[in-house]
């Protein structure tokens, strides 16, 4: 009898429910390809890419302009050297 009382008191309650996480199919929910958040992300990414390309174009134009100026300076210096060597 004492053995039964001890074993009943030492048992821990067992919960048969198991916690589990459910993940969506995509990063913003599994609403599929028409998900408005997904469209927003694509639009933002396109705007950022456009901005980056514009910045690169401006930098490239600036570098090309500098290259033209340096070529002119180089040509002038070469002409001076040629005139002095004659």
Swiss-Prot record:
Subcellular location: Mitochondrion
MF-aspect GO terms: ATPase binding; ATPase inhibitor activity
UniProt entry tagged with the keyword Phosphoprotein: yes
A single Gene Ontology CC term: mitochondrion
InterPro entries named among the record's database cross-references: ATPase_inhibitor_mt (IPR007648)
SUPFAM superfamilies: F1 ATPase inhibitor, IF1, C-terminal domain
Keywords: Mitochondrion, Phosphoprotein, Transit peptide
List of residues that carry Phosphoserine: 24
Any Pfam family matching the protein: IATP
Transit peptide, residue positions per record: 1-23
Family the entry assigns: Belongs to the ATPase inhibitor family.
Quaternary state and interactors: Monomer and homodimer. Monomeric at pH 5.0 and dimeric at either pH 6.5 or 8.0. The protein aggregates increasingly strongly with increasing pH.
Function: Endogenous low-affinity ATPase inhibitor, which inhibits specifically the reverse ATPase reaction of mitochondrial F(1)F(0)-type ATP synthase. Found to stabilize, together with STF2, a complex of intrinsic ATPase inhibitor INH1 and proton-translocating ATPase in mitochondrial membranes. Binds directly to purified F1-ATPase.
Protein's recorded name: F(1)-ATPase inhibitor STF1, mitochondrial
Organism: Saccharomyces cerevisiae (strain ATCC 204508 / S288c) (Baker's yeast)
Lineage, opening ranks: Eukaryota, Fungi, Dikarya, Ascomycota, Saccharomycotina
């Amino acid at each position: 009898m004492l053995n039964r009382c001890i074993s009943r008191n030492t048992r821990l309650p067992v919960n048969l429910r198991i916690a589990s996480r459910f993940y969506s199919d995509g990063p913003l929910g599994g609403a599929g390809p028409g998900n408005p958040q997904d469209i927003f992300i694509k639009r933002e990414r396109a705007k950022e890419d456009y901005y980056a390309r514009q910045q690169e174009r401006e930098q490239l134009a600036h570098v090309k302009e500098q290259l033209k100026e340096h070529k002119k300076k180089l040509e002038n210096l070469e002409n001076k050297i040629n005139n002095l060597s004659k």
